[in-house]
Amino acid sequence: MIDTKTAIEKITNGEFDNLFTDIYIDSSMIDYQKKRYVHAIEQYETIFCPDKVAIFSAPGRSEVCGNHTDHQHGMVLATSINLDTIAVSAKNNNDVVRFVSDGYDMITLNINDLEVNDDEAGTTVSLIRGVLRGLKDHGYKIGGFNAYATSDVLVGAGLSSSAAFEVVVGTIISGLYNDMKINSVEIAQISQYAENVFFKKPCGLMDQMACSVGGMVNIDFKDCLLYTSPSPRD
């Protein structure tokens, strides 16, 4: 956790440039990303208040080969991309999630109400509710939090904006309440559950797996036994 003022200073002074290069690969994107992160932190301060926060990222994805074979028990080669969803987040002192996505109104939900609501099908709140329910059912600690998110993953462009969103919500809970101990495969599976059951979209698991594991991944869905292996960068 880092207080918002210090985070802005460190980003502006270039102390995280190596980290940005590792995440986004393209060094020409670093200045843009620094401004983007500073803006996100400033928006968090405006909407909520200056605070000690954590900043999370989940990338979009592109399939290399095997699109739609994930739900036909085939093999998939997919990769994360350097367009991502980032979220500035902190615990709050109640059982309420307050989530603001750039350009949208605040979503508020109580973590004690995690039942499927058919009226929420196809909405962002259903994804948050579904991820929280999945994490709780898997025995993980959940709690209230405030978050501001912004995304460069284009909606409707085949880059899995919804999967990136689900994964960033799961990663927020992993970071704030579970010491970042929820593994990426489980976050992906819970994200798929949220999209299938709460959002009401019968998607496969490729999108969430590529977004959560990161890098290039080879996924084998044969006999419904999930095996995933990161592929080398070079």
Predicted regions and their residues:
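Acidic, low-complexity central loop/insert segments
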Residues: 90-94, 98-117, 122
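Short linear Ser/Thr-Pro motifs
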Residues: 101, 106, 160-162, 231
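Structural signature of FAD isoalloxazine-binding scaffolds in flavoprotein oxidoreductases
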Residues: 75-93, 213
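Gly/Ser-rich oxyanion-binding loop with an adjacent helix/lid
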Residues: 2-75, 110-226
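Conserved small/polar residues in nucleotide/adenosyl-binding loops
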Residues: 227-234
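Glycine-rich, histidine-containing beta strand-loop boundary motifs that form or position
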Residues: 66, 81, 91, 101-103, ...
